[in-house]
Amino acid sequence: MAKSMNFSPRTIEASELLGTQIRIGRLERRWTVEELAERVGVSVVTLRKIERGDPSVGLGVAFEAATLTGVPLFYEERARLLAELRHARDRLAVLPSRARKAGEVDDAF
């Protein structure tokens, strides 16, 4: 049995916004739920979860539905998205490869 997640209100609201935008894009293109589900490569049930804003749906699947329906992800221009991705990768490269718990500070002297 899958573990139940407790999502923060902001996550729930953002998921609902993305799902609503995807539904608007689908309706503007006059695609049925079945048509978009086929284009995304998921079941109708999964697509309905996306449109309802279910935060448990896979991120890549939701992003693909958004891309196909014209919902902008981060930046309209692909060049800007790629530039931001390069910047994020550069920042990540200078950080430690993993986080370690900070040791206790002994300040009793």
Positions of PLM-derived features:
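Short amphipathic alpha-helix starts
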Residues: 15, 40, 74-76
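A short, Lys/Arg-rich alpha-helix, primarily the initiator
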Residues: 2-28
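Short, charged recognition helix plus adjacent turn
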Residues: 76-109
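DNA major-groove recognition helix of helix-turn-helix/homeodomain DNA-binding modules
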Residues: 58-76
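Short basic helix-loop element that most often maps to the first helix and adjoining turn
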Residues: 20-35, 64, 94-100
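Short alpha-helical DNA-recognition segment
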Residues: 30-48
